[in-house]
Amino acid sequence: MTVQQRRRLPIASRETLQALLSEGAQALGVALSDAQRGALLDYVALLAKWNAVYNLTAIRDPRQMLIQHILDSLSIVPHLGAHGAAAAALDVGSGGGLPGVVLAIALPGWRVTLNDIVHKKSAFQNQAKAELKLGNLSVVTGRVETLRSGADVPAKFDVIVSRAFADLADFVTLARHLVAPGGSIWAMKGVRPDEEIGRLPDGACVKQMIRLTVPSLDAERHLIEVELDEAI
């Protein structure tokens, strides 16, 4: 059995997921090629296959993985597009590669770096990079506050994003030194994080808060863009 065969979901399941992905992406306004859709489904298959080994997600069902991980991550793509077709992004606390792997697939002109402190999760991220042939994806292990541009990472980032990393104020404090001029920090949240916003550090303010609608997901989702004085 080839690597390609091992990572594929059963045909019926894959067809069902493909329809769900196509409908969801269309509803979100995200254009995906056949190759991109295939890569996203291969990624779901990798998550499902290796979850028990790497402890990547509490979700076990591939359909729910597609909804709660893939479509949820795709929902931010139209909003991050304001940074252009060739931006550099850092995904902090990436875990199984979310949303960074999805961004690397959906935005092939972007350079995406995944960051986590857990080595086995970085190992899975590197495996996903290799199996999905994502040349625009990099992996760096370590605490984000210790990373230095020009050393641990090549340069500062236009976009720093997190899906489930920390309190918003802590996220901004720990990652702000890696934001490039003109860049910003984006936090994916569930319910509106008003208390967290109230604790933002000096020199940081909310530029916009977007209520997201994720297809097939009955849950609140918000995307918060934080602007920094030093990055303006």
UniProtKB/Swiss-Prot annotation:
Residues forming coiled coils: none
Chief place where the protein resides: cytoplasm
GO MF annotations, alphabetized: rRNA (guanine-N7-)-methyltransferase activity
EC number(s) recorded for this UniProt protein: 2.1.1.170
Source organism superkingdom: Bacteria
Entry keyword rRNA processing: yes
Cited Pfam families: GidB
UniProt cross-references to NCBIfam families, sorted A to Z: rsmG_gidB
Name this polypeptide is given: Ribosomal RNA small subunit methyltransferase G
Organism annotation: Burkholderia pseudomallei (strain 668)
Organism lineage string: Bacteria, Pseudomonadati, Pseudomonadota, Betaproteobacteria, Burkholderiales
